[in-house]
Structures are given as structure tokens and as C-alpha cells.
From Swiss-Prot:
Family recorded in the similarity comment: Belongs to the cytochrome c oxidase VIIa family.
Protein's organism: Ovis aries
Basic and acidic residues: bias regions: 1-13
Membrane topology recorded in Swiss-Prot or TrEMBL: Single-pass membrane protein
Subunit structure: Component of the complex IV (CIV, cytochrome c oxidase), a multisubunit enzyme composed of 14 subunits. The complex is composed of a catalytic core of 3 subunits MT-CO1, MT-CO2 and MT-CO3, encoded in the mitochondrial DNA, and 11 supernumerary subunits COX4I1 (or COX4I2), COX5A, COX5B, COX6A2 (or COX6A1), COX6B1 (or COX6B2), COX6C, COX7A1 (or COX7A2), COX7B, COX7C, COX8B and NDUFA4, which are encoded in the nuclear genome.
Name recorded for this polypeptide: Cytochrome c oxidase subunit 7A1, mitochondrial
Amino acid sequence: LENRVAEKQKLFQEDNGLPVHLKGGATDN
């Protein structure tokens, strides 16, 4: 599970150019 989250964050960073936590990582929940 932790790996999947890391991958999501990675894709999110590449897609938006910003860390997930900066955009409000609540979207992942």
C-alpha cells in the first residue's frame, strides 16, 4: 500500500510539478 501511495505522489508531482502535500494531499484520501 505504501508503495502505491508513493507512486501516486510521484505521478502527481510529475503531472502538476508540485508535491502532493502542497496541493492538499486530502485528494488521495
